[in-house]
């Protein structure tokens, strides 16, 4: 994955960007074969919900059985890091510039939105996946569901 051109991003702001990207990305089944985001977002949400209880259970189980605490702590830390890994990946992905094939498709979707009378802000610099997510979300809200068939 390439890094953004002239954008300096704080490590912790990547998590916020990842959360925003996960909320913005349209979870449409028709996008799943083309983009990996549907699976990553679903798994990240699952990890946010279930990994903290798994970590607590692992620690409590080892303490209750009088087992070694070291491996239990390592397992708990790994379980707690899984949601963070997903959010970090989503944050990095949101800043990644679009490849040429998707870039053409992005401009076609924007063109369809403008033809439908939607006012769109001009694209600054090279569009990234966050801009694609914003455009797709708006397209699924404003346009007919068949707009993907024409592209």
Swiss-Prot record:
<dbReference type="Pfam" id="PF04217">
    <property type="entry name" value="DUF412"/>
</dbReference>
<keyword id="KW-1133">Transmembrane helix</keyword>
<feature type="transmembrane region" description="Helical">
    <location>
        <begin position="69"/>
        <end position="91"/>
    </location>
</feature>
<keyword id="KW-0997">Cell inner membrane</keyword>
<feature type="topological domain" description="Periplasmic">
    <location>
        <begin position="66"/>
        <end position="68"/>
    </location>
</feature>
<dbReference type="InterPro" id="IPR007334">
    <property type="entry name" value="UPF0208"/>
</dbReference>
<dbReference type="GO" id="GO:0005886">
    <property type="term" value="C:plasma membrane"/>
</dbReference>
<feature type="transmembrane region" description="Helical">
    <location>
        <begin position="46"/>
        <end position="65"/>
    </location>
</feature>
<protein>
    <recommendedName>
        <fullName>UPF0208 membrane protein YfbV</fullName>
    </recommendedName>
</protein>
<feature type="topological domain" description="Cytoplasmic">
    <location>
        <begin position="1"/>
        <end position="45"/>
    </location>
</feature>
<keyword id="KW-0472">Membrane</keyword>
<keyword id="KW-0812">Transmembrane</keyword>
<comment type="similarity">
    <text>Belongs to the UPF0208 family.</text>
</comment>
<feature type="topological domain" description="Cytoplasmic">
    <location>
        <begin position="92"/>
        <end position="151"/>
    </location>
</feature>
<keyword id="KW-1003">Cell membrane</keyword>
């Amino acid at each position: 994955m390439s890094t953004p051109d002239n954008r300096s991003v704080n490590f912790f702001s990547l998590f916020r960007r990842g959360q925003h990207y996960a909320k913005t990305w349209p979870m449409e089944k028709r996008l799943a074969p083309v983009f990996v985001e549907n699976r990553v977002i679903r798994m990240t949400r699952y990890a946010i919900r279930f990994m903290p209880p798994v970590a607590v259970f692992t620690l409590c189980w080892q303490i209750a059985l009088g087992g070694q605490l070291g491996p239990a702590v390592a397992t708990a830390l790994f379980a707690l890091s899984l949601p963070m890994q997903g959010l970090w990946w989503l944050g990095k992905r949101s800043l990644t510039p679009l490849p040429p094939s998707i870039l053409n498709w992005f401009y076609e979707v924007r063109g369809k939105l403008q033809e439908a009378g939607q006012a769109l802000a001009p694209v600054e610099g090279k569009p990234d996946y966050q801009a694609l997510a914003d455009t797709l979300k708006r397209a699924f809200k404003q346009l007919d569901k068949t707009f993907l068939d024409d592209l």
